[in-house]
Amino acid sequence: MIKSELVQIIASRNPHLFQRDVENIVGAVFDEITNALAEGNRVELRGFGAFSVKNRPARSGRNPRTGETVDVEEKWVPFFKTGKKLRDRLNGAV
């Protein structure tokens, strides 16, 4: 599913909302999650999961094509940990 499909589904389930309004709401939710992560904060959606950022320290890597050793810089990466309700639903428990 892509963002536009999500917007269409939400709009169809809520006929009192215009699709443009749903697009704005979904965009605002994603923007706020992104902003919180950029500030180093954790975003928890109970039952669904938690978004956070983790640090990947600098390390030596290898170019798979040439075998040459390269330095990989330190970086921050997004991380998602599923909530119990989501895990249970995916594994058949309801």
Curated annotation (Swiss-Prot):
> GO annotations under biological process?
DNA recombination; regulation of DNA-templated transcription; regulation of translation
Q: Could you say which residues form the signal peptide?
A: none
Q: According to its UniProt record, what is one Pfam family this protein matches?
A: Bac_DNA_binding
Q: Which UniProt keywords apply?
A: DNA recombination, DNA-binding, Transcription, Transcription regulation, Translation regulation
- List GO terms (cellular component aspect): chromosome; cytosol
Molecular function per GO = DNA binding; structural constituent of chromatin
Q: What InterPro entries has UniProt attached to this entry? A: Hist_DNA-bd, Histone-like_DNA-bd_CS, IHF-like_DNA-bd_dom_sf, IHF_beta
Q: Its function?
A: This protein is one of the two subunits of integration host factor, a specific DNA-binding protein that functions in genetic recombination as well as in transcriptional and translational control.
Q: How does it assemble?
A: Heterodimer of an alpha and a beta chain.
Similarity remark: Belongs to the bacterial histone-like protein family.
Q: What is this protein called?
A: Integration host factor subunit beta
